[in-house]
């Protein structure tokens, strides 16, 4: 079988769509040997590699009211739009345990994408033994510029991987993935507009990091180029793309009912396209 793998876009709480898709895939036992994720996609990636269907839903939806992990309340309390300590420490280590043992013993290659604030380039990171470093990488991958603190990984300041590489299909292809299954959190045809307000704030906050400012400035351009590449590969049958078929939620959506509907859409849509996705990936069922 040609090497197959998952490529997971981020998108804040839009990641519940991806969680719904992956939960159905995991229930069917479809674990591909490679997964790469960005931001919320990185969070989904580690739960996929640890074989924990339902965990992302628990963290993102079921504990939403109790955790108050997203929104202005979190920004005031923790100086981050998302409560990073809750998501990457309290949840995985106390409330909704992350299965580190299964993750570390898994033969799955799991790559997490962050943006190096010094270079403005993507860093593709992995960890197979150190629990704290794994969660620090996930935190860095999800640390949105301006509204979340910069995170140090191995002494290097990093922010959200989506700044430098929102959908790392090129990295997957470079790693030898011949059958990429890409899960996007935007509808077909979406193109990103320049984030002018974010750029203005970044120019004030990140004067020490000119390459990060440049990456933020050109993020929309590179994102749209990546969408063009994915659409071209899709049209030629070289990738299998899964994307929402209904209007998407905002990346800071914090209403449990809205998120549940979007999660359920991902889960039900996965049912509809499962045989096609499995056939494309060359997956023939659990051995």
Each predicted region: which residue ranges?
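Patatin-like phospholipase
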Residues: 1-38, 46-287
